[in-house]
UniProtKB/Swiss-Prot annotation:
Active-site residues, Swiss-Prot/TrEMBL: 117 (proton donor)
Example of a GO cellular component annotation carried by this entry: cytoplasm
Domain of life: Bacteria
Name of the protein: UDP-N-acetylglucosamine 1-carboxyvinyltransferase
Amino acid sequence: MDKLTIQASPPLAGDVIISGAKNAALPILMAGVLAETDFVVSNVPNLRDVSTSCKLLRCLGAEVTELGDGQIRISTTNLNEFCAPYDLVKTMRASILILGPLLARYGTADVSLPGGCAIGARPVNLHLHGLEMMGAKIEVKEGYIKARVDGRLKGAHIFMDMVSVGATENLLMAAALADGETVIENAAREPEVIDLANCLIAMGAKITGVGSATLRIQGVERLQGCEYRVMPDRIETGSFLVAAAVTRGRIRCLKADPASLESVIAKLEDAGAKITTGEDWIELDMEGKRPKAVNIKTAPYPGFPTDMQAQFCVLNALAQGTATITETIFENRFMHVPELIRMGATMELEGNTCIIQGIESLSGAQVMATDLRASASLVIAGLVADGKTIVDRIYHLDRGYEHIEQKFQGLGAHVERVQ
């Protein structure tokens, strides 16, 4: 199994090109099932979860062609299977996003209950309740969600009990082909949801309220393929910016989307970073200074993203002062904390809050990645730890970061992948 070995590195310096957003690419690939003609997606990152999505589409009978340079073409002409099997779904929670498109276009879908990162329950009941309101008959048995509808799904007024990105995306895709108007209230407003909505509109869907908490979808009878470019990955961008801040460096993130990162940029500025932005780039200059501690509370967009929480744990571990980080989205999302403590960090957990006392330096250690963003935080910690850090189980990292060691090497970091 691959590992990353990391030696204490100089301040990061230079330019890094940001990949397409995993969390936008996955639902957009699933949306290919809705299109009657060829659908071409570009700026798709080369990641394990993307490969799993392509395998899933092929398993359903879709023709998936990787055209190179981050382009994927999907043709559903021969799609004739309607079951997403356990062996694929168990490795990636986003497989649940095939449910809405299959049901809306073909009237039938069997999807194994999902797996993915081990961060909390993340129940699928919001997805199922919304589809039932649209007329689907759903039963969960033998580990599978079995959904059926006679004819088309029907438009419905759906109020989401809690903000859920995945459920918003699933219902948005299903509603695009439903009969009549669907209103989704308390919808997720994340940039990746906006990206999916814009993609569906490019296919011919009628959606208003994009980017707000109330989405209105006027169902159409058919959707056509289109060419669509996936947005830049705001979490990858944020991870590199934090790494630069922690190493007291200066970097530019190119092909980025500053507008999607306002809450993260604000916290980095609070920590003492000088940040400049253009239309598609962000520059961070720490000017050689030690970061200042910043309090964080995660929240649905436009609040501070839960996917950046672990990286800010590392920043605060090395900052001047004491800070608290409160996680409100997922339970069980501080699994990186015991690993950072092994590296010398002064941290204490109280319920869903981590209290962090900043110290001058960390020590290299052998640590274990437990989920995707936790593993990124351990890599960042390794860049500034004395001695050698070995990060085990980096298959988690490969689920969400494209060419991570090469990108860090390009900024001057001492990071290597070993077998």
